[in-house]
Every structure is written in C-alpha cells, then in structure tokens.
Amino acid sequence: MRPDTAPGAPLLRYRRQPCCIGDVGEEVRRTTYDRAQRRAYRRKVQLCLDVFETMLTKSRFDSDRPLSGMEIECNLVDGNYQPAMSNRHVLEAIADPAYQRELGAYNIEFNVPPRPLPGHTVLDLETEVRTSLNEAQIRAGSDGTRIVMIGILPTLMPEHLSRDGWMSESTRYAALNDSIFSARGEDIPIRISGPEPLSWEAATIAPESACTSMQLHLQVAPEDFAANWNAAQVMAGPQLALGANSPYFFGHRLWSETRIEVFAQSTDTRPEELKVQGVRPRVWFGERWITSILDLFKENIRYFPSLLPELSDEDPVAELAAGRVPALPELRLHNGTVYRWNRPVYDVLEVDGVGRPHLRLENRVLPAGPTVVDMLANSAFYYGTLRALSEDQKPIWTKMSFAAAHANFLAAARHGIDARLHWPDRGEVAAADLVLDTLLPIAHEGLRRWGVDAEVRERFLGVIEGRAKAGRNGATWQVATVQALEEDGMTRPAALAEMLRRYCDHMHANEPVHTWPC
C-alpha cells in the first residue's frame, strides 16, 4: 500500500504545475499573443512576485512533514526498437492518470505520488514503481509497443523528427514551438562536439523531445531553500557523472550525457548575435550562489521574456487578503519556461481538500534509466548528500566558486564517470574516486538523518559504490556494447537497435547497470 494512501493518512495532492516544454501542465488557450497581452502578462508576473515575497515573510508554508516525489520520462518503441509515435493510444490503453503525455508522440511520463523518505519508503517505492511500469507495459504492449527508460533513445534518427506526427496533440506544445521560433527568427542549429561530431538544423523544437529525464522533487521550508539549492548545484557534477545514460543522438556518439547539450541547444531562443552579446540562455545552470528562493524568481523576471503570456482571472492580492492561498499561475508558468537544472517550485499542496502553500526543489539533472534500482540508487545518493551538505556548518559552497560547480557539471556531461572534477581540499579528482572516498560517507550520513533504515541505505548506496568501483554506468555500457557489435560486423543502425534490445531485457531484469554483460 502506498504511504500516501494508508488508512487514516491525509489525502495529499499537488496541484500540477505548468512546467517545462515536456510537461503537460495546464493547456493554454491560444498559440499566438499580441503586444497588449505581453505587457499585461509582464505586469501580472511582477504582481505575483510581490505577493510571493509577502507570503515568504507572513504565510505558513507546509514543511512539517517533507515529502519527496519523482517523475520518470519514458520512450515508446515498436517491435523493431524504432520510435513509436503512439502515446495517445498507449495512454488510452494504460488508463492510469499517473501516466501523462510528453512533448514527443513517442514519449510518456510516469508521476510517482509524493511520500516521506524515512524508514523503508525507498524499498517500498522500488516495488511500487516496478509493479506500475510492468502493468503499463502489459497494457501498452498489445501491439508490440515497448516502454523504455533511457536518456536519449539511441535509435532515434533525423527522419523521425522531420515529418509530421512527431509532436503530441497539445495547444501548449504548439504555442511553445511558435514562441521559441518567433523569438529566434530562424532555425536552430544543433552543433555538438564529441567523438563523432553532429551538425543539424532544427526547424522545430523536436530535438528537445529526445531528452527524457528522471526528475526528483523535495519539499523544502522557505528558510532552508537556499542551502538546499546551493548544495544541489554543487552535487550536479558528481550526480551526472554517476548517472550518465545518453551517449548517442541521431546515430552519433557524442557526450556521455548528450541530453544536456541537446536540451540546451534545442530550446535556445537566442540567435547568434544575442549569444555574442552575452544574453543568458533559457536552459541555465545559473551564475551565483543564492541566499533566498526569491533570488531565483527575481532572476526569472529580470532576464527572461515570457514565452507563454497566458493570463488567468486570479487576483493574487485579493486571494491573499481573503485568507486564501493564491495559485500564482503567471509566476509559475513563467518559472516553467526557464529551464534550470535545479528548479525552484512554488505549489499548493491540498491536504484533505485544504490548500497549503509549499516550496519544492526540482532536480532535473539525471536521465531516465537504466533500471528502477539504478534510478532509486541515484535518488538515494542525491537525497543523502543534499541533506548532509545543506546542513553543514561550514557549507561547501563557501569553499568553492560557482564557476567550478558549473565546470564540473559540463565535464560530467561530456565525460561521465571518467570525468575529473574539482573539489575543495582535493583539487582535481576522478569522479569515481570522489564518490568512493568523499561523497558516499556523506550520503550515508544524510540518509541516516532522514531516518532511512540501514538496510535501505546499504542496498541503494551499495549500487552507487559498485558503479563507481566498476567505472560503468548506462553511457559506458551502451558505448561498449555498440562497439562490440560493430566489431562483429553490424552497421551502426543495426548495432544501436540490437543494443537497445539487450538494454530493454536488462532493464526489466532490474539488475544494476554495472553488472550487465556487454
């Protein structure tokens, strides 16, 4: 039984935030906006920010029983392991509101209900997620469709995204596509370096649909948000080095976590001239440590014009004055079109039908896959290090420049588990050594503070230890397997399809990726 539905437990529901391109969120009413709407939206977003600032000082945010949550973005493939543009039919077959459409017609998302971390929760979650995904696969697979958890579908090729039908049916997605290209005024060049460099011109935001991630949510008190966000930024590099799972895009071997660069380039609203001027990209690591969640929302408004200036009827000042919790839809919608790897979230948690404001930190660093046990090991490592680092009396971010944290993130995206990362008091160190010598003990201590049972800590952090010792994650396994198949005479497309077939078999077996044979 799920913790949030146990007898006598309060009924907990998030009001789904209209978030990034890949999230369904709330549908919009139009695909184009005039100048008056944009001016009115700018004023409304600022008004929402003013109300939010007041709430931070005067309102009681729900944080007594911090909850964690998870979203897993998945791909759909046919019997030949090629992209299946069939999410509408698949979702009808699954018939479970926990599964939603994503940007691409070959994508779906699984939303895991929020729950507390202590005790055996993560072990229970492993069983629940596996059961749900297996049931979804049975229902979706009547026509041979398979659900795949992976950072980028390796069999995805340009021709799949160059014809009609790649996008899910949604006014919201069409509006975002139009807004991004209106801002740019030209096609988006996709230029990615690596062992097999890629150059391609995108006439739509279709390449973004290739990027499927696992998103981790943590409910945080307002006074603790800055420390948690700073710690998450520090951990983004090590996190990504361990979890990289996207070495191929359009048949090219590129970065260990190519998803990072594909996402950044495919949603870039800046033409070349604005890049040269130093205009900030919407996919953004950030540029400084923060002292309040308000810093991030102020940056959103200061640096980024609206993409979807959709106005609501809510008067946030009147709502707050009446003692109700304002939804602040304009602030949230705008926040959802600034693509931070660690995103602040304002939301309203409904407890037994009563709305309570709360804040979440949404970690968007990791790719989906390879297995449920690997993803939960990644989440345990993240939640553990986050707890310990955010509570340190001498915070690590006071000993480390923000630029160094960003450099670690990019090095991890490029080189994965073979990356060398900068760490205070250690200088430049191999990512695997940093995990084994420094970060695993921190993660154990953090999970202990969360009240996570010892056997749970040992199971999931043991997976992280095994991965670091073996030097193998999803990206290294994919590359090694494709290389072996090509050495046996397979073409690249055939090798990618066969690799994906084996990947799916291992995924369902739920053995950690570092134990998989090539």
Where are these regions (language model features)?
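Extreme N-terminal basic, low-complexity initiation segments
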Residues: 2-5
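Phosphate/nucleotide-binding catalytic core
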Residues: 8-518
